[in-house]
């Protein structure tokens, strides 16, 4: 997957630009008054479309690369890989382009891998017919174009992007107004690293601080009324300040652990790994995830869960003993995750101090596991 890094890096920087400058709640729009999203609306829309195209290309190339490895013969390789690319683009992207649906920025590798095995099985099963009727691939290609048209205009809910949308809706229904007890917050938070490990799409509620819950509104009303907040333990107050630094599983801790371990051992670090740091700092983990083996890697899952659990338990204790004020204020899009706690607490400097301590602790948790990984960061 490292061959796809340039596409992921370009996508990440487009998202960074959009969230910092062009979105409705962009960081500089709210902090500096730069309303570039209004003045350059057409440019913003084109960037959004282009970022979707980049993700489609990345997904399609991922499937194509897996098909190449499974095909294991040079004959018909060009036709097979071309068919794989078109099929992936059709099934994932046609409805997204037509209905302007956002694509999942943390790819569902497991679903795409299963699609590859299904696709290769179909192609190998029809191999003898392809040799007998050379025109059959053209018929399949025309059928795919027709399928793309149907997906874009009438069957969009049955495309893969439609499946992701229904999964997101189902998850939102299940979680309701969000967990408001520390045990339920811990349980929901641990679901994110598990889904990332399994290569399944992670609901947006678990990857970004969500302001859609009623508990957040009630907390803000209580603060403005100078009363005790009714819900001190929520995803916004427990998970968002520390456990989402760099992404689910405290990815920034993993990055710093890999970097410091290689420096300590005197090993070289790849340019791709270094270039993924700034996007990771600005809440875009996709380039970093393409340089680190996360999919079905127990050596990554265990410290991801431990880091999330330890950091959130410490946050619960800090809030319980009133050593920290809960984060209740909404922050702009694109806010670096290391500054979230400081801004969402209305400038509580203790969040910056605890952030350093929490990152060092997560590095310590990841360190022994990084020492066992092979080829990471090279």
Language-model segment annotations:
Residues 30-36, 288-378:
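Transmembrane alpha-helical segments and their short flanking loops
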Residues 44-59, 177-198, 227-249, 340-364:
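Hydrophobic alpha-helical transmembrane segments
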Residues 1-128, 295, 313:
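Early transmembrane hairpin of solute transport permeases
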Residues 1-9, 69-78, 131-144, 180-190, ...:
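Alpha-helical transmembrane segments and their helix-start/interface "positive-inside/aromatic belt" motifs
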Residues 215-304, 308:
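Helix-loop-helix junctions within the multi-pass membrane cores of secondary transporters/permeases
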Residues 57-73, 121, 193-200, 237-267, ...:
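Transmembrane alpha-helical segments in integral membrane proteins
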Residues 36-47, 68-72, 231-236, 257-271, ...:
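Short juxtamembrane and helix-loop transition motifs at transmembrane-helix boundaries
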Residues 146-216:
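Aromatic-rich transmembrane-lumenal/periplasmic boundary elements in polytopic membrane proteins
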